[in-house]
Amino acid sequence: MKTVQEAPLARYVREYSALPGLQQADRVEYILCRHEDMLCFSARRKTAAAPVSFYTAGLEDAPACRMLCYLYENSIAPEQLRDVLADLCGWTL
C-alpha cells in the first residue's frame, strides 16, 4: 500500500463570487490523480466534507486531463461529476 500521495496529474480551481439574491460565494476544486492502474477524478466544494470521486481504468493520462479541463471549463457541479464522466467514459469501477 502506498503511503506517499503522488502529485495530481491536473488541478483546476473555480471561484464563484457572491451575488446577492442569486448565489453564495463558493469554490470548486477539480483534481485528477493516478492510483496504480486507475485514474481518480474528484471535485470538491469548499463547504463539502468530502470530495465526489470517480475511478476509471483504461484511459490514458492526456485524454483524462482534457476531460478534467472540460469539467472545469463547463462548471460541472461535483454532484454531477459521476454522471458526466460515466457518459464520457462509458463505465466505472
Regions found by a protein language model. Give the residues of each.
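Mixed-charge, Lys/Arg-enriched low-complexity segments
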Residues: K2-T3, A50-L93
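Positively charged, low-complexity intrinsically disordered regions
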Residues: Y12-E15, H35, K46, D83
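Generic detector of low-complexity/intrinsically disordered segments
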Residues: R11, G21-Q24, R34, D61, ...
